[in-house]
Amino acid sequence: LVDFVEYLNEGFEPLHDKIISFSDQTKDSEIEVALQWKNEDDVTVKSFANNIHTLEGGTHEEGLRTAVTKAINDFAKKRNLHSDISLTGDDIREGMTGVVSVRVKEPQFEGQTKTKLGNTEMKSKVQVLINEEFPKWLSKNTKEGRAIVERCAVAAKARMSAKKARELTKRKSILETSGLPGKLADCSSTDPTESELFIVEGDSAAGPAKQARDSRVQAILPIRGKIINVQKVT
């Protein structure tokens, strides 16, 4: 599988030179796993069962995804790397090329094309192998492990930035269609419990207010005319 991963990553810049590989063999099954991260955004995961390419994935592929996510998160937590960021499975798999191949005595193939492995025990077997061996590899290759975590953190930050941009765009379109004044300098927070709206008199007052505000939680709305002191009026 190491040669296969090397072939799949031809033309790409690897994040680490060493291709990670594990294997295990029992009387009932055989498991091989190979992993390598690259400086690209795409994800490549290939899985095989009894030399059949399981195009629709299956339990062995689920075990690979789950265990890799756990191992990287555990390593990052142990080394106190980017503790302020929660790495998702998608963050961790970005740039990853992973291959898992299993052999089972009685394979159960599912799906429309019968290319999905359904043997439930293979998920836990693949997980056990990776959960045992991958942390050992990361401990022995801390430089490569840190590089992988850094790569995952970049993916996480990009995901969060994209989410924030979508929320701001959505919020802006809601404000534009709700009839609210166009001069509203909105805040970035979407939590109403911490957000504040300051109404000021005219554009001249709005300028200094915008400069002095906390743009994360404070919005500024300039309006025309004198603002009535409601307390005095009542």
Where are these regions (language model features)?
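GHKL-family ATPase ATP-binding module
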Residues: 1-234
